[in-house]
From Swiss-Prot:
Species per Swiss-Prot/TrEMBL record: Yersinia pestis
Localization in the cell: Cytoplasm
Cross-referenced InterPro entries: CutC-like, CutC-like_dom_sf
Main location: cytoplasm
NCBIfam families documented for this protein: PRK11572.1
Keywords: Cytoplasm
GO molecular-function term, one example from the UniProt record: copper ion binding
Name of protein: PF03932 family protein CutC
Family stated for the protein in its record: Belongs to the CutC family.
GO cellular component term, pick one: cytoplasm
Record carries keyword Metal-binding: no
PANTHER family: COPPER HOMEOSTASIS PROTEIN CUTC, COPPER HOMEOSTASIS PROTEIN CUTC HOMOLOG
């Protein structure tokens, strides 16, 4: 059966995702930057309170995936901490200046990761040649690749996603579709034979604050609504999981 990974930007969201039936959580912070490394406190709380597999992202900043020596050292330190805390896996990716997989650095990351299941994240979608990148990641023995098929969303990238699935049919990383995967379009990914789906399955939640100071913001973008935040919608996760169960070959014959 196709698995559902839910992208969570807080431990609260991870707990909601688990309760709603998610198979796995990708734990991040910094939604506006596309996900960056969660704090040590968040990692510890997730480890203590979430029982399904949690894969924290290790990404020291937003933007591109070509990192300074300090950034890279920080990444290795974060991965070591995640490994030592006993997480099931980690989500990471590093490119070189020409848009290829940075193989020397990725080999170091794989070594530091130890028994962690490594997901190579959507840095894959920024690679020059996806099929060469796939071969390199297979050589590294990463567990899976999170990708939109090198498009702005995974539905637009279905053609490449199908090619990647075909190329890894017998061996290689699991291809996990992500970016714009929703209840309304997920059947397309199931029909394409994609084994894992990644979704934020969320909604905007208003702040509980009654007093709201006017004219002062913490964000550089003063148009951002700071009295709301994005959170996983448990009902959406439940509905997505139900569709996956009904869409599985076993369910169709029972």
């Amino acid at each position: 059966m196709t698995k559902l990974e839910v992208c969570c930007y807080s431990v609260d969201c991870a707990q909601i995702a688990e309760k709603a039936g998610a198979d796995r959580v990708e734990l991040c912070c910094g939604q506006s930057e596309g996900g960056v490394t969660p704090s040590v406190g968040a990692l510890m709380q997730a480890r203590e309170t979430v029982t399904i597999p949690v894969h924290p992202i290790v990404r020291p900043r937003g933007g591109d995936f070509c990192y300074s020596s300090n950034d890279f050292t920080i990444m290795k330190n974060d991965i070591a901490r995640i490994r030592d805390l006993g997480f099931a896996g980690v989500v990471v990716g590093v490119l070189d200046t020409d848009g290829h997989i940075d193989m020397p650095r990725m080999r170091e990351i794989m070594s530091v990761s130890g028994s962690l299941a490594v997901t190579f994240h959507r840095a894959f979608d920024m690679c020059q040649n996806p099929m060469i990148a796939l071969k390199q990641l297979a050589e590294l023995n990463v567990a899976r690749i999170l990708t939109s098929g090198q498009q702005q969303n995974a539905e637009l990238g279905l053609a490449l996603l199908k090619d990647l699935v075909a190329a890894t049919k017998d061996q290689g990383p699991i291809i996990m579709a992500g970016a714009g995967v929703r209840l309304t379009n997920m059947q397309k990914f199931i029909d394409a034979g994609i084994r894992e789906l990644h979704s934020s399955a969320g909604r905007t939640v208003p702040s509980t604050m009654r007093y709201r100071k006017a004219g002062v913001t913490m964000c550089a973008d003063s148009d951002v609504d700071e009295f709301s935040h994005y959170c996983v919608d448990g009902e959406v996760v439940e509905a997505m999981k139900s569709l996956l169960v009904m869409g599985s070959p076993l369910a169709k014959h029972t």
